[in-house]
Amino acid sequence: PHDVGGYFDFSPGDEAQRVRSDITRALLALRIHVEMAHHEVAVGQHEIDFRYEQALHAADNCVTFKYTVKGIAAKHGLIATFMPKPVFGINGSGMHVHQSLMDTKTGATRMYDPSGMFNLSAPARQFVAGQLVHARALAAVVAPTVNSYKRLTPGYEAPVYICWAQRNRSALVRVPRHSPGRESNTRVELRFPDPSCNPYL
């Protein structure tokens, strides 16, 4: 790893911050809307979140993102890896996918229900249930390598339990807290995909 920083670490002269800034500028030039870029928990680990899109466009953005990161890292004399668990004994890298359901005719969210558990609608809860029921089969697609399973171990904020929760990062599906007035942002986070997966599947 190129640094020993921690979560949201930032210090003057931070080479990693310069690289993240270059990556962010390049992604914006490629019309990928970056929402956040910061150091993650593990040494040499970084997170760059980009804005939601329709599924196919999001998959395109994911592939473009990887090529961009690798190219800019190389220009800085670094090697970027998207391995789920490149270093034993520290947190691995996931590719958490935030998902929402929209009405195809109106574009309105189908996720929100003020009377539902965690403010989730019945279709949203059924959507989550389907992913939990089929989690083992989905793992072949979203965690497709031997290294994927080195990440999915207890103690490293990895999703190791087939369940859903609001605050427990060990859950396969997390439900971000509801923000009043932002009902259209209601979503669920599928936490067990990792960067080695094919985003088109």
Where do the model's predicted regions map?
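Glycine-rich, acidic/polar active-site loops that bind/position phosphate-bearing ligands
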Residues: 1-201
